[in-house]
């Protein structure tokens, strides 16, 4: 089975930063809009799978009103992976835009919010149109759920392949 760009991207991030304890996921969005719920759904799945540092879940979304305050509490030495929904071309719906750099939340709807993350994942949940809010509101929940499962699964797979060797070394005897 061929690995996706999302999987390859996350494997490279996990190889560079294998300690799960040093990773913070900032999952941006709201539970009040189908398309914009991608981030909080991923955050909820990651939290349920045992990730300790997750900002933005369905219970406590990290949306345009709270994102600036939420990221102020992140430790300086943390590796931040920002996750958000976005709109794109009709051909790109269901795909992911990944970057070795920050994400600018709210850009699709004209909001000016600070860039977030050392790495970023944007899920293209619908086609861009003249009314971005409407496009996000009318996004398929089935598509969003599938993309969220794919993202959370790829994250877990990447870090399970790149275990923190220092944690295992305490059980090894010198040769």
What role is predicted for each listed range?
Residues 1-80, 85-175:
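N-terminal catalytic or cofactor-binding beta/alpha core of small enzyme domains
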């Amino acid at each position: 089975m061929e690995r996706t760009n999302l999987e390859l991207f996350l494997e490279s991030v996990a190889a560079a930063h294998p300690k799960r304890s040093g990773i913070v996921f900032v999952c941006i969005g709201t539970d009040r809009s189908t398309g914009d719920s991608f981030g909080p759904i991923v955050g909820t799945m990651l939290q349920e799978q045992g990730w300790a540092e997750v900002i933005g879940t369905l219970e406590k979304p990290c949306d345009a009103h709270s994102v600036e305050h939420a990221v102020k509490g992140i430790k300086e030495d943390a590796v931040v992976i920002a996750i958000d929904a976005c709109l794109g071309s009709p051909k790109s719906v269901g795909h992911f835009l990944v970057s070795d750099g920050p994400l600018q939340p709210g850009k699709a709807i004209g909001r000016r919010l600070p860039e977030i993350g050392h790495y970023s994942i944007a899920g293209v949940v619908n086609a861009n149109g003249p009314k971005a809010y409407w496009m996000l509101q009318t996004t398929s929940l089935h598509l969003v759920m599938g993309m969220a499962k794919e993202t959370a699964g790829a994250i877990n797979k990447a870090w399970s392949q790149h275990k923190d060797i220092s944690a295992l070394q305490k059980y090894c005897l010198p040769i």
